[in-house]
């Protein structure tokens, strides 16, 4: 499937607004709530999930700009990359992560607007491309963040994933 700049930007803005609406009103206790994860994975909180979403959005902007991957991220598999993000951000405040989330959205939109047309229409891509800007974000928003901030009784009935 070929995409248009306008369609990708529209999807990106739509998901950002949904996510920002949720995280903008979190209490300090909600930021610290654990999200459903297998015991073998790092113990993410709501804050860690937002940092994860934001990192991969920033990585998409980097890729769209044609910038190289940072040396410390080269050659990492998905689990190793996710762990690196967790270790970088786990001691940072929710305020820092929220500010980064908002700055990265500006960076993403700038990258999308500045990208050559061939980025969007040069080759066929998956329907949800670029996935980290909407589908991946929506998945973590719904399955991690929104689930974790539900009432505790409903949260306990949720099954762990990943």
What are these regions (language model features)?
Residues 16-27, 57-62, 102-116, 142, ...:
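Structural signal for well-ordered, non-membrane alpha-helices
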Residues 1-4, 38-41, 86-93, 126:
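Short amphipathic alpha-helical segments at helix-loop
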Residues 32-83, 117-162:
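Short, contiguous alpha-helical
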Residues 1-18:
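Extreme N-terminal tail/first-helix region
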Residues 15, 81-119:
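Acidic/histidine-rich alpha-helical segments that form the ligand environment
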Residues 7, 11, 48, 52, ...:
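Alpha-helical initiation/capping and key positions within long helical/coiled-coil segments
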